[in-house]
UniProtKB/Swiss-Prot annotation:
Protein name: Autophagy-related protein 22
GO biological process, one term: protein transport
Native source species: Candida albicans (strain SC5314 / ATCC MYA-2876) (Yeast)
PANTHER family from the UniProt entry: AUTOPHAGY-RELATED PROTEIN 22
Stored Gene3D superfamilies: MFS general substrate transporter like domains
Pfam families linked: ATG22 (PF11700)
């Protein structure tokens, strides 16, 4: 009996083609369903509520927590003459591991070490997030941990070294967890953008701005609570930073409650099919990501500019807020500090919203907005450098300088952060959102801890709180130069060619 092998072969080929066509149809249907989900207003509002839930603890980790650690370090520390530290001035030193450092530098050293650990976590997360079917669960869990880490601060009222160490550990864990939820939260922005086929860039600007605005609004809520506590609960001299500790714990409760409510309605994201083991995947994807530089050069170039600017922004804010208290006096300026940090978040929210409305109205070249925002960053750091010379009456040595630059720097920096998230999302290949947002966080961490360490060493060795503004100013200059060479249109074309 003869068998028609050609018939069998052709039949096998036809079956394979039918299977591939069916898989393509299923993939197209899944993509359409995903687009329909991310077009729903209810889903967008739930995501915004989730952004709001991170705001209370995020604002505390940038304001009250480092201020509290600074105060505890001052109470524990000694002067060069082995006397108790005063409320003003720089003559105060405290033990940090195996060395003794300036009490303000202690916070900068702590942040540098925590950021280095944060980088390892970010590399692992950016490698697995796009392949996981539990992105929603990871996001909610990271925000819950964020809230729970803030709860113990209410008990850290003792002025001893053990309390300082415990506060430092909690602060470090908050910094590490911060990168986790930022990577996962930011990876949702491209999903909302791609759901709008008509004008994804305008959609992205709205999503990025409102997400940041709601986060700031959550921070404002916690800071209002801090103001009420500070002005109703005793004098600054009697209560001091203890008011901060209560506000931090209340912020943790808000974050936990709101994140649990959002978890009921936020949709999950279907992960990509993976072949490698989860332990191998992060490192393999990271090296594959570096190979994509030739394919998406503008995305990488923009990422570098964003990372350098973001490092300078974080350095500036940490130095600026600590300098405010050391210049005006620890303890007796605490009530004013609550209003000061509150105004920072008000200006941040105002800045990003104004930019969103102006951009939608004029729809001018989005890159020119970046130039103007970066110019303000350059001016703010240059102004701080003026104070290095002791005979100069300017350079953040007067109360009015802190308040004026707080308004302009906070507003333009918030707008710049929204702009970066929007533009960067338009340069990312589809299906790799978490990986590329993780790249931004990872590169920021890899370079940020070095910048923080350099600033801490400079401040510690020079005993000058304003000297670190000098290297920070050069970071802004480098960011501006890299930003100049980014061709946004070419970057978008690269993505379209890669997805086609």
């Amino acid at each position: 009996m003869k068998v028609n092998h050609n018939h069998i072969s052709n039949t096998g080929v036809n079956d394979s083609e039918d299977i591939l066509e069916a898989q393509d149809e299923i993939s197209i249907d899944n993509n359409k369903n995903q687009e329909n989900i991310w077009n729903k207003k209810s889903i967008f509002h739930t995501w915004l509520l989730l952004c709001y839930s991170t705001g209370p603890v995020a604002s505390m980790s940038r304001t009250y927590i480092p201020a509290s650690i600074q105060s505890i370090a001052k109470n524990v520390g000694k002067t060069k003459m082995n006397q108790p530290c005063g409320t003003q001035g720089n003559d105060c030193y405290v033990k940090f591991g195996f060395m003794t450092v300036h009490h303000t530098s202690y916070v900068l050293y702590l942040r540098a070490v925590s950021t280095a650990i944060e980088g390892v976590v970010a590399i692992f997360l950016m490698g697995i997030a796009d392949y996981s079917n539990y992105r929603k669960s990871f996001l909610i869990f990271s925000i819950l941990v964020y809230g729970f880490l803030a709860l113990p601060f209410i008990g850290l009222t003792n002025n001893d070294y053990q309390t300082l160490v415990l506060a430092s550990i909690l602060y470090s864990l908050l910094i590490i967890d911060d990168s986790i939820y930022q990577i996962l939260e930011g990876s949702y922005i491209p999903l909302f953008m791609r759901a709008d086929k008509k004008n994804p860039m305008q959609r992205g600007s709205v999503v990025a701005v409102l997400g940041l605005f709601l986060g700031n609004l959550g921070g404002i809520t916690a800071l209002v609570i801090g103001i009420i506590i500070s002005y109703l609960s005793g004098t600054p001299e009697s209560k001091g930073y203890h008011n901060f500790l209560l506000a931090i714990t209340i912020a943790g409760c808000l974050t936990i409650g709101l994140s649990l409510f959002s978890a009921l309605y936020i949709p999950n994201v279907q992960g990509k099919q993976r072949i490698d083991n989860f332990l191998v995947l992060p490192f393999k994807r990271f090296f594959n990501l570096l190979k994509d530089i030739q394919k998406y050069p503008m995305a990488f170039l923009y990422c570098i500019s964003w990372v350098i600017w973001n490092v300078s922004f974080n350095n500036f804010m940490s130095m600026f807020l600590l300098l405010f208290r050391s210049t005006l006096g620890l303890g007796n300026s605490d009530a004013e500090y609550t209003v000061y940090t509150f105004m920072s978040y008000i200006c941040s929210s105002w800045g990003s919203l104004v930019w969103m409305f102006l951009y939608q109205k004029w729809n001018s070249n989005i890159k020119y907005w970046g130039y103007s925002f970066l110019s303000v960053s350059l001016l703010a750091n240059f102004w701080g450098c003026l104070g290095i010379h002791k005979l100069t009456p300017l350079g953040y040595q007067n109360r009015w300088e802190f308040w004026v630059f707080e308004v302009f720097y906070s507003a333009t920096s918030s707008a710049m952060r929204s702009l970066n998230r929007c533009v960067y999302s338009s340069l990312l290949p589809e299906g790799n959102e978490a990986q590329y947002f993780g790249l931004e966080v990872t590169l920021g961490i890899a370079s940020g801890w070095i910048g923080g360490l350099v600033n801490a060493v400079i401040q510690d060795r020079t005993n000058d709180d304003r000297f670190p503004f000098l290297p920070n100013m050069f970071l802004v200059v480098v960011s501006l130069i890299v930003y100049y060479y980014v061709d946004l249109q070419k970057g978008k074309n690269d993505v379209n060619n890669g997805n086609s």
